């Protein structure tokens, strides 16, 4: 019977100054060094992924906008009707839109 792996191990060699700084920050927050490092890394990873997804969506949206703007415009029937109504209004009121 296979058992499911629910945890993974992460090791890192760091400069002693970084280690002492992390240890001090962990102590200030009342957490273990491991808990502190993992929680900060986890939050930073979520933030990085979120920013990347927003950027990727923005690039995709730009491509869609450029594609839409490069196509010739063809008004739909409702827009054509609205233009006809507007032009009729202008002819009835004597107002000229060329000013």
UniProtKB/Swiss-Prot annotation:
Coiled coil: which residue ranges?
A: none
Protein's name according to its UniProt entry: Orphan antixoxin protein TacA
Keywords linked to the UniProt accession: Toxin-antitoxin system
GO biological process: any one?
A: regulation of DNA-templated transcription
Give the UniProt family note.
Belongs to the TacA antitoxin family.
The record's section on SUPFAM superfamilies has: Ribbon-helix-helix
Report the protein's function: Putative antitoxin component of a toxin-antitoxin (TA) system; its cognate toxin (usually a tRNA acetylase) is unknown.
Q: Which Gene3D superfamilies match?
A: Single helix bin
